From Swiss-Prot:
Disulfide bonds: none annotated. One of its GO terms (biological process) is rRNA base methylation. This is Ribosomal RNA small subunit methyltransferase H. It is found in: Cytoplasm. S-adenosyl-L-methionine binds at residues 35-37, 55, 84, 105, 112. The gene is rsmH. Its main location: cytoplasm. NCBIfam families: 16S rRNA (cytosine(1402)-N(4))-methyltransferase RsmH. One of its GO terms (molecular function) is rRNA (cytosine-N4-)-methyltransferase activity.
Amino acid sequence: MTNEFHHITVLLHETVDQLAVKPDGIYVDATLGGAGHSEYLLSQLGDEGHLYAFDQDQTAIDNAKKRLAPYVERGMVTFIKDNFRHLKSRLQEAGVEEIDGICYDLGVSSPQLDQRERGFSYKQDAPLDMRMNREAALTAFEVVNHYSYQDLVRIFFKYGEDKFSKQIARKIEQARSVKPIETTTELAEIIKSAKPAKELKKKGHPAKQIFQAIRIEVNDELGAADESIQQAIDLLAVDGRIAVITFHSLEDRLTKQLFKEASTVDVPKGLPFIPDELQPKLELVSRKPILPSKEELESNNRAHSAKLRVARKIHK
């Protein structure tokens, strides 16, 4: 097992630059990971500024403490080991009621994918795990071996958007009736066997969407993102900014919807004025998502599906 986090940060400058960092501001990196965004953000803060960095993976925090050592020594960064769905309560515990900016880099980090024993990847043989927080109870093994056929179909359709969800769930049900499905490669082979030959010729691994679905279920990724982004919008000071990087359509759809709800107002036309409590909280900084540059796409394969959405707080 390796404890080193080798991670190329996606949309690094675009994300932090869009936060319009104030040297004395209070900022949050909701997804510390390899600490790339945190490091660049901290480089723009003065001694009066502070960064709160969230991650539920102790390995990520341990590595970030080394990478960010100069800022740690100056007392400019606080690490919070928790799921970002507890953003508001954990910041309030730290005495923070308002923030000037926050960034999210959603999904699984590439170091987690690269650590074979974490069981995130269909490319490496490992026990079925997929927990971002290794202390959590629910694992991929539990989902694959104990969820009902109906529940498997539901999560495969909902989180994997795989049109062969029923066939795959049926194959899993058949396989586990003989013996438990214990490893990533076992599961990948079962998924492959459920798909027609012409489907296997298509670009991309046949197990990709199902592994994504199981990972999202194990970590409740969309539920956590939904709760956290709403809390972040409330915590932002007026003129504060929120930047969210997504890697698949479900994350992007969720972010787009939350930003839309907070930046539009649902009142009858012709109303002489909009009451304070109905004023939109956000303004979109960019109507369309910001995409990686040609140079970044050439140097970092993970960047291909990345989209960045940014909004600014305009009303408390």
